[in-house]
Amino acid sequence: MPAAAHDKTRIPRAKIAELLKRIKRADSVEVKVVVPMSAHRATIKSIGMDPIEAEPRQVFFFDTPKLDLYKHGLMVRARRIQGGGGDSVVKLRPVNPENVREELRRSDRFKIEIDALPGGFVCSGSFTRRCSAQQVLDAANGKTRLSSLLSKGQCRFFKEHAPRTIGNKTNMNALLTLGPLFVLKGKLKPKQLARGLTVELWLFPDGSRNLEISTKCMPNEAFTAAAELRTFLDARGVEIAAGQETKTAAAMKFFAAHRR
């Protein structure tokens, strides 16, 4: 990658102090890069990913027609995973870890994570519940209420952060199902890296795609992990997209452009 391109992918100095502050209170850091669609095929080949070994998933989001939850930094998502498993997630992004209740921090279902992308980062709080793939499908198809897919803790977290007009069970159950989006998730363990790689290919109904490569690490390993990932990708000529955005942001941009 040319030096000028590297400059665009560095986190601005003004944000470094904030990042260091957030890292101290985070549970984990996920270093990510998004690859432009024109380079997907070459990237998958160069990093050694076998598409046949990828795990298929279906991802659903739940929001209002105007995406009011997303605009308030709140996301409700459910996933169906190959083999009959699934999960539901209520995520707040961005979040200041210092403002999170200690009771919530002690829950093994709640995590503070930093997504670090070229040029920036975002800190999020995620409340997760495991469920079956059928439970996800039933809620997505309206056979069961969305609230039945969430735990009491998730419902409380939702109510605390949703807009007042939405933050109760009645309005929660009236949210639209957005999706599904089809996802292929692959895991790699290159010999050149101390940590494994996760590769996710998100396929949108209009034919567009989002390819993200990431590695997860402990907060005190973040800068080392980022440098190692960039070195690994540079050595293989992987092109980094000029506009970096999270998978959720890409999905919501799609849904905003294709409102019912």
Explain the meaning of each model-derived region.
Residues 2-260:
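Phosphate-end processing signature that detects enzymes handling 5′-triphosphorylated RNA
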